[in-house]
């Protein structure tokens, strides 16, 4: 879809200074941040507390709780520090959510997302037709 991305590996616990420095350096340069984290999963919340850039939290399955610990850490944010959170290990939905947020600013992206949804709907209809022909 032509969306420019920056990928970093940083930790809210192990590299907090570098994380905050990076967030400060991209202020005004990016439209949305996707923050993937497992276990305690404080990364999206720390980022959201450090910037007004929208943050999409992506919980990762990485512990004995199958990612539920990560998910709950992200959705239980305190009032005033929101993190838009998708389902566990759902990188595609995180990207689509980020694109939807960006589509407010970029009309071409909105059209691309409409086309994507139309293609998904058509696939369901094609699958329905195909299975009924097999019966």
Can you say where each PLM-predicted feature lies in the sequence?
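C-terminal binding/interaction regions
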Residues: 5-6, 68-135
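Short beta->alpha connector loops at strand-helix junctions that form conserved
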Residues: 9, 58-61, 84-87
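Glycine-rich phosphate/diphosphate-binding loop of Rossmann-like nucleotide-binding domains
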Residues: 1-14
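Structured helix-beta-strand junction loops
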Residues: 1, 28-29, 81
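Short glycine/serine/threonine-rich phosphate/pyrophosphate-binding segments
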Residues: 15-17, 37-46, 65-68, 91-95
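Glycine-rich phosphate-binding loop
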Residues: 22-59
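Glycine/small-residue-rich loop that forms an oxyanion/phosphate-binding "nest" at active or ligand-binding sites
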Residues: 50-79
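Structural motif
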Residues: 12-24
